[in-house]
């Protein structure tokens, strides 16, 4: 399941593009998540009232949360699979406080792949998409194991 060094380099190359605009990428990813899977919006008291894409695009809170999500994910990706320290508090909050099912992490992973491909087609070809998909699967597998340790079966 681990990634090769070459795969990690593909992931981190496109991630550098994301970091140039974490808020913009994050907002677009969350909008795609919420539009594709409206049930996920119910987990966010702060955003439940946002019904249209225009409202979502106008929300500074959504933009800030997108920045927060991608900052955390970037920190995990940069650890190249050695993300235990970063993952533990994230799993704790998502399992016990927010109660985010693993399925929702699959949904946001799909949104990430889609947005990166649409925004960076020349840097996110088939090899990079496969590497990012693998990295996100590793993240989900490891967070699911933490969920299980915490007794959360979301």
Swiss-Prot record:
The listed locations are: Cytoplasm, Sarcoplasm
According to the UniProt entry, which residues carry Phosphothreonine? 68
Q: Which SUPFAM superfamilies match?
A: Globin-like
Q: Where does heme b bind?
A: 94
Q: EC number(s) on record? A: 1.7.-.-, 1.11.1.-
Among InterPro entries, the record links this protein to: Globin, Globin-like_sf, Myoglobin
List of residues that carry Phosphoserine: 4
Residues annotated as binding nitrite are 65
Superkingdom, natural source: Eukaryota
Q: What class of enzyme is it?
A: oxidoreductase
Q: Which positions, given as ranges, span the membrane?
A: none
Task: Show where the Globin domain sits.
Answer: 2-148
GO terms (molecular function) for this protein are:
heme binding; metal ion binding; nitrite reductase activity; oxygen binding; oxygen carrier activity; peroxidase activity
- Residues noted as binding O2 in the record, renumbered to the chain: 65
Q: Which GO terms describe its cellular component?
A: extracellular exosome; sarcoplasm
Q: Name one Pfam family in it.
A: Globin
This enzyme catalyses: Fe(III)-heme b-[protein] + nitric oxide + H2O = Fe(II)-heme b-[protein] + nitrite + 2 H(+); H2O2 + AH2 = A + 2 H2O
Biological process annotations from GO: removal of superoxide radicals
Principal location class: cytoplasm
State how it assembles.
Monomeric.
Job description of the protein? Monomeric heme protein which primary function is to store oxygen and facilitate its diffusion within muscle tissues. Reversibly binds oxygen through a pentacoordinated heme iron and enables its timely and efficient release as needed during periods of heightened demand. Depending on the oxidative conditions of tissues and cells, and in addition to its ability to bind oxygen, it also has a nitrite reductase activity whereby it regulates the production of bioactive nitric oxide.
State the similarity comment: Belongs to the globin family.
PANTHER family registered for this protein in UniProt: MYOGLOBIN
Q: What is this protein called?
A: Myoglobin
Source organism: Indopacetus pacificus (Longman's beaked whale)
């Amino acid at each position: 399941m681990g990634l090769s060094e070459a795969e990690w380099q593909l992931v981190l190359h496109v991630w550098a593009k994301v970091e140039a605009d974490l808020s913009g990428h994050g907002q677009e990813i969350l909008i795609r998540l919420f539009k594709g899977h409206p049930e996920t919006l119910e987990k966010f008291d702060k955003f439940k009232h946002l019904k249209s894409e225009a409202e979502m695009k106008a929300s500074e809170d959504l933009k800030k949360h997108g920045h927060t999500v991608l900052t955390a994910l970037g920190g995990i990706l940069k650890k190249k699979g050695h993300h235990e320290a970063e993952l533990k508090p994230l799993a704790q909050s998502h399992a016990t406080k927010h109660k985010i099912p693993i399925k929702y992490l699959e949904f946001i992973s799909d949104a990430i792949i889609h947005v990166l491909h649409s925004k960076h087609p020349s840097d996110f070809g088939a090899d990079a998409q496969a590497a990012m998909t693998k990295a996100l699967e590793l993240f989900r597998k490891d967070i699911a194991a933490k969920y299980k340790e915490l007794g959360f079966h979301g």
